[in-house]
Every structure is written in structure tokens, then in C-alpha cells.
Design a protein with these regions (language model features):
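Cleavable N-terminal export/targeting peptides
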Residues: 1-32, 293, 320-321
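Signature for the C-terminal beta-barrel architecture of outer-membrane proteins
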Residues: 30-42, 52-56, 66-74, 108-113, ...
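Structural signature of outer-membrane beta-barrel domains
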Residues: 44-48, 78-82, 121-123, 159-162, ...
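Short acidic (Asp/Glu) patches
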Residues: 99-100, 124, 136
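Residues on the solvent-exposed faces and adjacent turns
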Residues: 118
Length: 321
């Protein structure tokens, strides 16, 4: 299996002194680090109208070293060969891609968190208008929890190369900047507003979520490219319901949305999860648990964008220690 990781010597030279500082408590002395890890395995069938069907697999590996209750070093290793793709295809030359895409130091307290290094593209939940959850940003993120269920996030760094093999190639990317304000209004309403600069473009993003009931949430998301007359909009709902078969009830989760992406929106549109194309589109996904004991899940998803349609179906297994 091919495993390519670029040199990260400069990053380690910066992170290691911070690890040494974090690993020492003035009152308790040296603290023993704790290692944890998680592995997600997915196998899926991908049938797209504009090309032959294929069978794919994905591995996501999350190792983490907790230095103290606040400090940790984290990494992320995944299959696939570009920013928004994390699947390898059986029976082709692209069956053995496996790359480390992140390596970062995190400090987290009740007041917020700071991440430094090759960091995730998200601070928590991944929005439909956000960057792919398998992507990366080289830089620093700071999230500050404010009063009344509000928070502000600032990310400063670099982002340009979308090849997973170049994720650790520091210093050759364009500037990346993001500032985001998020808030909850009671138990049912929440919103986010952000400004982003990336890939030689500037973007304003807004998101509103409304909790319909205990199970279902409706949302609307808009990203406007401010230096061009182009936008992306997503309107949808997510939640869960109970299906019955053979006198047995099965909880099923769903996710459905309509979207529109201008053809002139730019490269940012291609950096979302499983990008299918620009224009009018929609998606409907159902998922559930096959085995709680063994942490096995199933999913079925149908996507349509203009004249292109896609059907995805598969299973996912998780292991954690």
C-alpha cells in the first residue's frame, strides 16, 4: 500500500517545545500522556449516470495524544487522493492511496479552543456549504465561547493545493482567512455568519437552523462570492423517524436538501464533500444502525445535479480505543 507523507520537520520543531511545556503541571509535576485512537471503515457502491458504476472503500484514522486535560496532539490519516475525496476504488490504479492530512496541537478549555498546525476545516458540525470534512488548512484556529450561547471563531492560514499528497507541503499555498460568529436563540433557533477569503476569492456565508421538534431540524445556508456575482444556496431538513417491519421498530435518520451553485462560483464549490456539479440539485439520504454491539451502520443516498444523478449505498464500521 502506498503511504506518502511529506516532510514536516519545521512544524515538529515548533510543536515539540509546546508539548514539553504542556506536559508539565506546576503543581502536579510531569503528567503521563494518554493515547487514544479511532478507525472508521466504509465500503460503498457508487452508481453515477455519466460513468460506469464502481465499488469503493474509505479508511479514516484519528490518533490523538492527550498531554494534559487541556493539551493534545492530533492527526488524521485517510484514503483518497484529493481535498474533497476520501475513497479508493476497487479494481483500479487508485486502490492504495493513504495519506496523513493533518497534524496539529490543540488547547481546549471551557472558554474555547485553539488549534495550531495542519488543522481541520471545521470547528464542530460540518455545514452543507462548508469545506469537506476530509480537507485541511495550514494555520491556526481560535474559538472563543462568549456569553448567552454565542461564539466567535478566527482562522488564519494557507489553503491552495487540493492534492492529499501535498497536505504537509507547507509554505506554497495561498492565504486563508475566516471569521465566524455563531449563536443560539433559545432551544429552537441558531445561526452563523462568517466572512472568508480563500483561493483568490472573498465569500460571505450565513446559516439559519430551526428546530421543528425533538427529532427534526430545518436549515437554510447561503454563500455569496463578494468579488463575483455568484452564490450557493442550500435549503433542507434533517432528523430521524421510526420505521416498522416484522413487528420491530427501527430508528432511521434522514438528510434532505435542495441546492443551487452558480457555474462561476469558482474552485470553492469543488472543495465540498463528494462534489457532483454546479446548477440545481438535490440530495436525499437515509441511514441507520445494523449492529449497536459492533458499531455497524448502513446508508443509502440519492443525488441529482442538473442532468447527472448518483446512487450511493454502503455500510460503515467504527473502532475506538
Amino acid at each position: 500500500m502506498l503511504f506518502r507523507v511529506k516532510q514536516v520537520r519545521n512544524l515538529f520543531l515548533f510543536i515539540l517545545p509546546l508539548i514539553a511545556i504542556a506536559g508539565f503541571d506546576a503543581n502536579a509535576g510531569q503528567i503521563t500522556p494518554t493515547f487514544s485512537q479511532k478507525l472508521d471503515i466504509q465500503v460503498r457502491y457508487d452508481n453515477r449516470s455519466n460513468r460506469p458504476s464502481r465499488e469503493q472503500y474509505r479508511l479514516r484514522y484519528y490518533p490523538s495524544l492527550a498531554i494534559t486535560s487541556a493539551w493534545s496532539v492530533n492527526s488524521f490519516v485517510v484514503t483518497g487522493d484529493d481535498f474533497s475525496s476520501s475513497h479508493n476504488t476497487f479494481g483500479t490504479d487508485s486502490t492504495d492511496y493513504l495519506y496523513a492530512r493533518r497534524l496539529y496541537l490543540r488547547h481546549e478549555t471551557e472558554l474555547g479552543k485553539t488549534e495550531l498546525g495542519i488543522i481541520p476545516t471545521y470547528k464542530g458540525r460540518v455545514s452543507s456549504t462548508g469545506l469537506s470534512k476530509d480537507g485541511w488548512i495550514t494555520g491556526i484556529r481560535h474559538v472563543r465561547q462568549l456569553q448567552n450561547d454565542t461564539a466567535i471563531e478566527i482562522v488564519v492560514g494557507q489553503l491552495a493545493n487540493d492534492q492529499a499528497s501535498e497536505a504537509f507541503n507547507i509554505g506554497s499555498e495561498d492565504e486563508y482567512f475566516e471569521v465566524e460568529y455563531s449563536a443560539k436563540m433559545g432551544q429552537r433557533h441558531s445561526y452563523e455568519a462568517s466572512f472568508e477569503r480563500m483561493l483568490s476569492g472573498t465569500f460571505a456565508r450565513a446559516e439559519y437552523r430551526f428546530r421543528l421538534n425533538n427529532e427534526d431540524t430545518a436549515f437554510i445556508e447561503l454563500v455569496q462570492r463578494t468579488d463575483e456575482s455568484a452564490a450557493k444556496i442550500v435549503v433542507g431538513t434533517s432528523g430521524a423517524f421510526t420505521a416498522s417491519a416484522f413487528n420491530t421498530s427501527y430508528p432511521v435518520e434522514y438528510f434532505a436538501y435542495y441546492s443551487y451553485i452558480d457555474s462561476s462560483f469558482g474552485t470553492r464549490a469543488e472543495l465540498i464533500e463528494d462534489f457532483l456539479g454546479t446548477g440545481h440539485g438535490g440530495s436525499l439520504e437515509f441511514s441507520g444502525v445494523l449492529s449497536q454491539k459492533h458499531d455497524v451502520e448502513w446508508f443509502v443516498r440519492a443525488d441529482v445535479v442538473d442532468s447527472v444523478s448518483r446512487l450511493l449505498a454502503g455500510i460503515k464500521l467504527s473502532f475506538e480505543s
